[in-house]
Amino acid sequence: MRSGVIAQKLGMTRIFTDAGEHLPVTVLKVESCQVVAHRTLDKNGYVAVQLGAGKRKPKNTNKAERGQFARAEVEPKRKLAEFRVDADALIPVGAEITADHFVVGQYVDVTGTTIGKGFAGGMKRHNFGGLRASHGVSISHRSIGSTGGRQDPGKTFKNKKMPGHMGDVTVTTQNLKVVMTDVERGLIAVEGAVPGHAGGWIMVRDAVKKRLPSEAPKPGAFKLRETAGAVAAEATNEEGA
């Protein structure tokens, strides 16, 4: 099981196929998605990688967060998330995951927070039919009607579908096909809609219900950071030449 990535939703557009058909796609941007920490079986009881994405000013991070980012030698991140992985699929701390982590044609599962709709009635929130347009009904055409039973049980059961807050919940959409990747610009285009508004954070993982293509990189596609020693060695080699 490989790591996923933290991406940012840019919006929707369409891509034309060679046959002239157009596909509605959602464009996701993978930018500065780096490994911040590891979770190991000995220390934490499970194996995972903690990723960070986006940029945040140091003054807007607390002392504990600054220490965590300093140990990983990465810039402060706006979004953090963990992804469970196999023990042999750990990506080095500080490595930056790139858009070619996913290959064209593979399926992914995306997780995001849906757009909040505020307080909504039963017809909009749960697709209720409402009451009759006439024949004794006045004013309450869009109400949900009775919510309880008779004298027994004499109550409304918990989890009854009723008017209330709609949206702003975490939702996972499964089996979206990767249509295009652009490593230079850090873009991933997936077929279909992705939950959330433009600019929202999206967790992208390999689909659990589809087979991973053999050409998918393992443990992933990433760029290792340049250490001070490597930079100094390159400078020495250039001077010697």
Curated annotation (Swiss-Prot):
The modification N5-methylglutamine is found at residue 151. This is Large ribosomal subunit protein uL3. It comes from the Bacteria. One of the primary rRNA binding proteins, it binds directly near the 3'-end of the 23S rRNA, where it nucleates assembly of the 50S subunit. Residues 140-168 are annotated as: Disordered. GO terms for biological process: translation. The gene is rplC. Belongs to the universal ribosomal protein uL3 family. GO terms for cellular component: cytosolic large ribosomal subunit. Keywords: Methylation, Ribonucleoprotein, Ribosomal protein, RNA-binding, rRNA-binding. Methylated by PrmB.
